[in-house]
């Protein structure tokens, strides 16, 4: 099961590129973020649950399923938060983190959320996994109820089955894991674009729930031991008449109206600025904002765990770092005040349980968070 591998490091202060302030804390693995009529909503992936199982020929630790995921209102003035819907599917993958409510997008007063994972990779007797894993769901905030829109994870997993799977530790072009993990969603008139981090696909989901695979990202790292060794698309945004897809590999792709795919490398004088992207959004001026959950360097050793937020001007090609030294930031959204809001501490549970070794500083103190990054008004 493809997951965004996670670990811990105490972050330093944000860079001086923009003012960064904490809006809320005490969230449970916060991921997607958006606004409904000016009110903030956040998807919380949760912390799994008590129903554990071992994957055959898998890692030496159990995966644990529960109903601890939820979608919550967040008060940007007081920092308070309360669930709109709760008891959603969540699966803890041990040291690899948690999957649950992931990408979030708002359209016409409804909240649309992608649930991570897929039912094929869960025990068949897990009712909540079979009914909710990998689903695109629609939430009515007025009634605090939800309904399923489409079986994105199930469809994407089935798409991967005809592929030969990569050989572990060997460069394997043309291969694809049999996997799915729907992650990013963008609601538009008529339907939804979804990015699947497991199947490496960009999908179109119609309002009727019908799913079409628009593109399969088949890049493979020449060094199969790098993290990640495939693209792992995590987000999709629209700017200047093109679709932009961010990837955990650090790749950014532009897809035009004719279906042409071009890799774009935002950079400044220091070099390329994208490392491990988990979220992206745009503003009304065509600027693209991308969240690096992790930084450069050797995977899972400092300073790898320090993320950043990058601004890319899709018209001019100029790029800059808005904020750095952020602990596992995840997804962004432009707020009604014109500033950028980002979930952070996305591997942290609400209680702030430390993932660090005993005696080390706790980077999750205060639990998952929402940060505000000031944007210029010009």
What is each of the regions a protein language model found here?
Residues 199-201, 249-251, 295, 347:
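Loop/turn residues immediately N-terminal
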Residues 99, 107, 114-169:
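A gly/proline- and charged-residue-enriched helix-loop-helix capping module
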């Amino acid at each position: 099961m493809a997951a965004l591998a996670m670990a811990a490091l105490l972050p330093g202060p944000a860079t001086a590129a923009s003012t960064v302030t904490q809006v809320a804390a005490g969230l449970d693995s916060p991921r997607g973020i958006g606004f409904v009529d000016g009110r903030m909503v956040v998807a919380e992936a949760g912390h799994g649950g008590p129903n554990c199982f071992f994957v055959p020929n898998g890692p030496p630790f159990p995966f644990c399923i529960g109903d601890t995921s939820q979608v919550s209102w967040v008060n940007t003035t007081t920092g308070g938060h309360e669930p709109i819907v709760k008891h959603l599917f969540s699966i803890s993958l041990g040291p690899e983190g948690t999957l649950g409510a992931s990408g979030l997008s708002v359209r016409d007063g409804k909240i649309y959320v992608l649930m991570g994972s897929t039912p094929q990779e869960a025990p068949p007797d897990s009712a909540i996994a079979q009914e909710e894993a990998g689903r695109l769901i629609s939430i009515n905030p007025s009634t605090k109820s939800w309904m399923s829109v489409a079986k994105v994870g199930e469809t994407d997993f089935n798409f991967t089955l005809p592929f030969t799977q990569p050989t572990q530790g060997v460069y394997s072009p043309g291969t694809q894991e049999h996997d799915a993990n729907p992650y990013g969603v963008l609601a538009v008139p008529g339907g939804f674009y979804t990015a699947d981090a497991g199947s490496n696909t960009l999908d179109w989901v119609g309002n009727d729930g019908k799913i079409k695979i628009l593109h399969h990202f088949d890049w493979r790292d020449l060094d199969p031991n790098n993290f990640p060794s495939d693209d792992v698309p995590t987000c999709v945004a629209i700017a200047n008449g093109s679709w932009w897809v961010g990837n955990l590999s650090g790749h950014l792709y532009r897809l035009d109206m004719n279906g042409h795919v071009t890799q774009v490398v935002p950079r400044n004088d220091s070099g390329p600025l994208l490392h491990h992207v988990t979220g992206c959004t745009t503003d009304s001026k065509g600027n693209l904002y991308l969240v690096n959950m992790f930084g450069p360097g050797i995977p899972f050793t400092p300073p790898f765990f320090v993320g950043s937020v990058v601004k890319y001007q899709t018209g001019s090609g100029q790029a800059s770092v808005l904020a750095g030294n952020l602990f596992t930031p995840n997804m962004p959204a432009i707020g009604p005040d014109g500033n950028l809001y980002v979930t952070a501490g996305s591997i942290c549970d609400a209680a702030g349980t430390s993932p660090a070794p005993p005696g080390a500083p706790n980077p999750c103190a205060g639990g998952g968070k929402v940060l505000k990054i000031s944007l210029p008004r010009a």
